[in-house]
């Protein structure tokens, strides 16, 4: 893969055409009230584009298009083979436009171009292609009945899905939802975060080029309290697929209950525990994976290993190795292919992370201070040790490159510390002891448990959380459960 060089990407950014309109019923269009908002480059703080500010009237327009095409059956009743062909074409186009999409992602979010080009865009295309290839292999069932009856169990598309996605992995998380939703035959109204809407807008144009019927995918940009709320309270939306904060997830559940009891599938916050036992097979490897698990994407990862639990006897040795590994994660210009850490999404979020660091200085020892990183919205690797497990630093999702270290002396204590959280998205265990690995994996209250790695995985396995980290699953065939209805058809053969 050719990552080019800083000047290449800067020149490309200058000539980049940025689409800024809504996408409704197969066409780019201004918001009904002709209002816009600015999306800002987190490096320079300069405006990138004026984006259409969609509101409830625009959601209604998108709803009309989405419902109309769904009821006509242009997509919902089409064959799996047709859907497969269109979605594979979309994946092809995403790969062909990988540099453009990666640049939009990096300009919008401040993440390193290396990661956008190597991880985000290929991962997004892979998600679309995976469900394209899977959908004609999903079968119904025939239940056992008497000889004069036939009972069939079939899966049908839910209807119109509202997909609400966050700003940390805009295109990747969009495609985790679009892949199964579209493959199953649904129509989708996509609302990207107002902080990172550019790649979603561009994706809509590529979907039309791939042959997706008009109205099947609509993109309405805007704010959560306007466009987002219009979706969550809309009486004609059949389901919401959401990734974001636990606080917003709770509001979506309330809105669904107050409207039409639409399904709400949530992937929310996390405060994942990374547990290193004294019999860890390779402390150097564990330190490297731990650093990547908290500092990748500037710590703006829902499943980041933000709590490091170290067995007392190896804690000091491990922390020395971890400090060395942190040197590989230093903020730089996001368009420089050598950069491993970019900026946080914006200065407001950086201020929030700074406030946690200031508070943490009175709660534990600051082993590594990532402040003064050189860019306004950037924060480097930050590590606190010996923090009270009850402190907010240990319990709240910071969503930045801030690691909290706690020591333990027994397996039971490690388990108690790990599970003592409102969240349950991920956890990791480093040990040579296979029996311990099994015990811990089964007793940890988390949707994903990693043994001797951190956050490995691919499209074949589900992703989601326990407790206030959400419900339902993204990725794998299990994601189709969110986007399909299960119908029983009972036929009397003697009639």
Curated annotation (Swiss-Prot):
One of its GO terms (molecular function) is aldehyde dehydrogenase (NAD+) activity. It comes from Escherichia coli (strain K12). Pathway: Amine and polyamine degradation; putrescine degradation; 4-aminobutanoate from putrescine: step 3/4. One of its GO terms (biological process) is putrescine catabolic process. Lithium ions exhibits the highest inhibition (97%). To a lesser extent (5-20%), potassium, sodium, and ammonium ions also inhibit PuuC activity. Transition metals, such as copper and zinc ions inhibit PuuC activity by more than 90%. The presence of heavy metals (mercury, silver) or sodium hydrogensulfite in the reaction mixture completely inactivate PuuC; in contrast, disulfide reductants such as DTT and 2-mercaptoethanol significantly increase its activity by 75% and 27%, respectively. This is NADP/NAD-dependent aldehyde dehydrogenase PuuC. The lineage of its organism: Bacteria, Pseudomonadati, Pseudomonadota, Gammaproteobacteria, Enterobacterales. Keywords: NAD, NADP, Oxidoreductase. PROSITE patterns: ALDEHYDE_DEHYDR_CYS, ALDEHYDE_DEHYDR_GLU. InterPro entries: Ald_DH/histidinol_DH, Ald_DH_C, Ald_DH_CS_CYS, Ald_DH_CS_GLU, Ald_DH_N, Aldehyde_DH_dom.
